[in-house]
Every structure is written in C-alpha cells, then in structure tokens.
A protein has these predicted regions:
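Aromatic (phenylalanine/tyrosine) cluster motif
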Residues: 4-5, 21
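Flexible, gly/pro- and Lys/Arg-enriched active-site loops
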Residues: 63, 71-78, 90-97, 101-186
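Extreme N-terminal starter segment of soluble prokaryotic enzymes
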Residues: 26-30
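Short beta-strand-to-loop capping motifs
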Residues: 35, 84-88, 128
Length: 186
C-alpha cells in the first residue's frame, strides 16, 4: 500500500526493500493505535504522521481502521483502532519513550482512568523478536494475545508475524481468541 494516506497526513508507506537508513540495524516494530475522544479518525491519522516523523524510522504498513467496543471501562465511546509496522533504527526503550512523548505532547494526553477514554493511545506490541521485561518496558505487549481489537488489525498487515514468547503466528492467536469484543472494519 505504498503512498497510503500520504496526501492526507504527509507520510508515505514504502515497501521495506526501498528503505535506506544511516544505521546498521533496522527492526520491524508493531504499534497499536487507539482513540475514542474527539475526531477519532483524524487522531489516528495524526498519530501515524507523528510516528512517521521519528528519526531513523519509516512506516512500512498500516492496517485499516476498525471501530471497536471498549474493554475494561465499558461506559465510554467506541474506539477507532489500527496497527502499523515501523522499520526503525531506534532501540525499543527509546521508541517507547518517543511514543509516550507523542501521546503527551502532540495529543496532550492525561492519564486519569486506566483503560479510560483517550485522544490517542500508542502501544508497542512487538519489537522484532525481542523479549524485554524491564521496569519501564515490557515487550511483547503483555495483553497482545487477549485483544481482538489489536490482533485483527495486526493480522491484516502481518498474519505470519511470530509472537516471540508463544512461538505462534498472530493469525493463530486471533483464531483461538474467545472474546465478545465488537471489532468492525471501517
């Protein structure tokens, strides 16, 4: 999907083989995006643009947008969700810090209620095949295999990606998921 959304947000999605960075190692990271406050579609588009501006990084795939039922705190507006693949030279901790900075600075996100409403939520799902259990970072995302609103868009762009802890493909986790979440492709 090269050029996808480029006119709307100023970011192009190039084929991975066309990427060229000034560093030795690129890693494919998968990032979930979610919004249920304000203009949800515009928030996702803006977030893709902001992530696409990260140094040593390029958005190489973007799923469709999905309208999804809230999980946890259910008395809130439905979410729009998507997943993108980012080819990056940033290490996982730096990438996560940059994602949190986008939430805070570009979207003025204030965390008041866990799983509550938000203008944008950016979660680092996978960072290559890395398994990281740090004080400030856990990769793969600990609830990745439990969430249809993440697995469905992930499977759209990377059905064969392997979860480094389970050894299973994303599409296998989606097929095995027993969830009552509503996930509708827009």
């Amino acid at each position: 999907m090269p050029g996808f959304f480029s006119a709307a947000i100023g970011v192009t999605v190039d084929a991975p083989e066309r990427l060229c960075f000034n560093h030795a190692v690129e890693t494919d990271a998968y990032i979930a995006l979610g919004s249920n406050l304000g203009d949800r579609e515009l928030n996702l588009l803006r977030a893709v643009a902001e992530v696409g501006k990260l140094p040593e990084s390029k958005v190489t795939a973007l799923s469709s947008f999905y309208e999804t039922s809230p999980v946890g705190v259910v008395a809130q507006k439905a979410f729009y969700n998507a997943v993108l693949r980012l080819s990056t030279g940033l290490d996982a901790t730096t990438l996560l810090r940059r994602l949190l900075r986008i939430e805070d600075e570009a979207f003025k996100r204030v965390r008041t209620v866990a799983q509550g409403p938000r203008t944008i939520d950016l979660d680092l799902l996978l960072y290559g095949s890395a398994v990281i259990n740090g004080e400030t970072i856990v990769v793969p995302h600990p609830r990745l295999t439990e969430r249809r609103f993440v697995l469905q868009p992930l499977c759209e762009i990377a059905p064969e990606v392997i979860h480094p802890l389970t050894g299973k493909k994303a599409c296998e986790h989606l097929a095995a998921l027993n969830s009552n979440e509503t996930v509708v492709k827009l």
